[in-house]
Amino acid sequence: MTENIHKHRILILDFGSQYTQLVARRVRELGVYCELWAWDVTEAQIREFNPSGIILSGGPESTTEDNSPRAPQYVFEAGVPVFGVCYGMQTMAMQLGGHVEASNEREFGYAQVEVLTDSALVRGIEDSLTADGKPLLDVWMSHGDKVTAIPSDFVTVASTETCPFAIMANEEKRFYGVQFHPEVTHTRQGMRMLDRFVRDICQCEALWTPAKIIDDAIARIRQQVGDDKVILGLSGGVDSSVTAMLLHRAIGKNLTCVFVDNGLLRLNEAEQVMDMFGDHFGLNIVHVEGEERFLTALAGENDPEAKRKIIGRVFVEVFDEQALRLEDVKWLAQGTIYPDVIESAASATGKAHVIKSHHNVGGLPKEMKMGLVEPLRELFKDEVRKIGLELGLPYDMLYRHPFPGPGLGVRVLGEVKKEYCDLLRRADAIFIEELHKADLYNKVSQAFTVFLPVRSVGVMGDGRKYDWVVSLRAVETIDFMTAHWAHLPYDFLGRVSNRIINEVNGISRVVYDISGKPPATIEWE
């Protein structure tokens, strides 16, 4: 029997901070399982989850407003340690008898916190010392309100010049609140504080490791599907590739991978996928030529959301057809990962706007005929990559830039046509090749080319011609929730532009996208 890697677990209640998923990833990096739930969870749900500790996230609301989110009262009655971060500290203070007010000065950015009192949370943790030997911590603040009175059974652990209660603690109950963000890298000792809370105060063991996650996933797959046959849509992306390798280890020849060349893939991608998974790893793969079918279904459609839904629908139709040709296929496997699950849950409960339909989760018809197997649904992307390495997949494949599920279907703006896809494939391949040559590929987080359905005049030789426009897009980001456009060298951009215009007949102009996220998204559609 495999070890119970979920035995020690942290519950993170989400109050809406852009950093909340980062908190969860940091806890996982410490080797401890955690889950992210909406703040209005019930007492029964908390009891059932049985956490070793609870973290209250930051959030954009003000605790001084009457209808602002509050932690369920049971959080403070469950007998487990609680760690409030920013808004989480404020609602903890207010709910336990303290006071919060809007601050005259909004604290945003670096701050130095002076530790005044010994506390299990920060004992022995410091960045520097004051002249009289008190520990100082370099932290990242982001708050407007501030705690002006702490609950009577708490002590002040640390303060800044403008924030009298930067850290508060009730050591007996093991309740802690910090007015800064320990999860961001700008808080230099943040990981040590999270480690102190999760590993020492909550006494969680580091059971959440790649090797143990693989063993657990294999055991769960076998328990779920038994001797049934499973079908998987293999795209060659990180998530579906790691899913394929896990299933192959768990059930061997009972897995049939369906690789659909939908006409929306990158240059030579179909050949590369078949070579690696069919020839090298020995997986059972059915190769479906689907370009004409997908492009016919997409004909005349300009709306990005509709295009995503069409691509998802046709994928499922293809799977159903392939499954009917095989005997006893009862399960459809997918590479759904934890951020997909979080976003889909948020949209289902109305707690967040649907930015885009996830190809894996929201875009699938509800009448799908097979059961779902999702072995990665508890994992963040960085965890999926680590597991892929452990399973023997090549580094370059696992750390390739993200590629959307609908592929070039959302990188060709407006209606998708074969001509547009062919031009885009070749232009994009040149851009990526040049990034590798210039040693820039791993210095940007994501880079790709977008086809714009507008013609622009160009001069070739002695003649004028009207041809298509493409845009290059490269961004730098830590979490893909916010992003800056990458400041690529002008000579590099010039070289890429010249190559595309000279080598791809049909493109007359190349532009570079200098939009950040927000207000733009990373993908154009």
UniProtKB/Swiss-Prot annotation:
Keyword Nucleotide-binding in record: yes
EC number(s) per UniProt? 6.3.5.2
Domain Glutamine amidotransferase type-1 spans what residues?
A: 9-207
Which pathway does UniProt place it in?
Purine metabolism; GMP biosynthesis; GMP from XMP (L-Gln route): step 1/1
Give start and end of each GMPS ATP-PPase domain.
208-400
A GO molecular function held by the record: ATP binding
What InterPro entries does UniProt report for this protein, alphabetically?
Class_I_gatase-like (IPR029062), GATASE (IPR017926), GMP_synth_C (IPR001674), GMP_synth_GATase (IPR004739), GMP_synthase (IPR022955), GMPS_ATP_PPase_dom (IPR025777), NAD/GMP_synthase (IPR022310), Rossmann-like_a/b/a_fold (IPR014729)
Q: Which Pfam families match?
A: GATase, GMP_synt_C, NAD_synthase
Reactions catalysed, semicolon-separated, are: XMP + L-glutamine + ATP + H2O = GMP + L-glutamate + AMP + diphosphate + 2 H(+)
Family matches, as Gene3D superfamilies: 3.30.300.10, 3.40.50.880, HUPs
Active site positions: 86 (nucleophile), 181, 183
List keywords of the entry alphabetically.
ATP-binding, Glutamine amidotransferase, GMP biosynthesis, Ligase, Nucleotide-binding, Purine biosynthesis
GO CC terms, sorted: cytosol
Binding positions (ATP): 235-241
**Which NCBIfam families does the UniProt record give?**
guaA_Cterm, guaA_Nterm, PRK00074.1
Q: Which PANTHER family match?
A: GMP SYNTHASE [GLUTAMINE-HYDROLYZING], GMP SYNTHASE-RELATED
Role this protein plays: Catalyzes the synthesis of GMP from XMP.
Q: How does it assemble?
A: Homodimer.
Q: Which HAMAP family match?
A: GMP_synthase
Q: What is this protein called?
A: GMP synthase [glutamine-hydrolyzing]
